[in-house]
């Protein structure tokens, strides 16, 4: 019985959701569930210390644990290595901060009722996914009373951030880290099936030419190499917005390279 109990406790303590909660508590974040259509989205929110905050800073998670193998989708896309969560926790600013998970990440039971594997595979950037993220950001913005948002997305969350920036009128700054900003080129590069039910961020690049932005990639990233974001930066007319470093892999500690100060004056 003791062995069984110890195994149960060990399983609980390694739960990605409990790990996220514990990290959030250490940094003064609280859990929020956003009721949107069709998804319930998991978020972690910090109110910041500004008495009258103007800006909400949003960090959007990557695709998470989307695949068990190259041919078998995962049953739960909750990230094992939540890079965007680490980025949010490391934000040194005074503004409110929202960590926003992608659909079906971290949620359980009835909150997963609309979760099917297409939403973390072929439809990971589908219109209803973007609409759901958009609704959650609007709810969080109302909570803190912010006038504008800064969007920062990691990996596939970078693509989501781009599509949200095109959709919303209140985005002051767009940032991506190892962002999948040209999904057709990426699937061809990796030799995987096209994201047939998803929007391609590249298609909205020209509409974002006047938006301040920064797109960080790394030569050491073999999952989404710099050439993917370079195509996007050229299309926005802001080639200088692409910043390339040398020694961080796709799932590495990007917060050491991000340069949070690029957002502060926005």
Language model regions located:
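Bacterial signal peptide processing site
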Residues: 13-15
């Amino acid at each position: 019985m003791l062995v069984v109990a110890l195994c149960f406790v060990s399983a609980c303590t390694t739960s990605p959701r409990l790990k996220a909660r514990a990290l959030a508590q250490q940094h003064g974040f609280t859990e929020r569930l956003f009721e949107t259509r069709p998804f319930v989205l998991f978020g972690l929110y910090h109110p910041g210390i500004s008495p009258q905050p103007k800006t909400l800073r949003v960090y959007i998670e990557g695709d998470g644990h989307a695949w068990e193998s190259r041919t078998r989708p995962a049953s739960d896309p909750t990230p094992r290595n939540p890079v965007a969560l680490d980025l949010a926790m490391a934000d040194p600013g005074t503004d409110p901060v929202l960590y926003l998970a992608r659909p079906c990440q971290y949620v359980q039971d009835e909150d997963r009722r609309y979760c099917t594997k297409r939403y973390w595979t072929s439809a990971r950037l589908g219109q209803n996914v973007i609409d759901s993220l958009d609704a959650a950001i609007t709810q969080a913005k109302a909570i803190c009373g912010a006038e504008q948002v800064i969007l920062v997305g990691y990996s596939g969350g970078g693509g989501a951030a781009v599509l949200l920036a095109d959709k919303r009128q209140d985005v002051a700054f767009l940032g991506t880290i190892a962002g999948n900003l040209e999904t057709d080129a990426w699937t061809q590069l990796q030799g995987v099936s096209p994201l047939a039910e998803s929007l391609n961020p590249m298609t909205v690049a020209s509409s974002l030419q006047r938006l301040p932005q920064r797109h960080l990639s790394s030569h050491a990233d073999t999952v989404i190499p710099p050439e993917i974001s370079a195509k996007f930066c050229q299309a926005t007319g802001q080639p200088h917005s692409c910043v390339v470093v040398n020694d961080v892999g796709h799932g590495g500690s990007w917060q050491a390279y991000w340069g949070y100060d690029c957002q502060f004056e926005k």
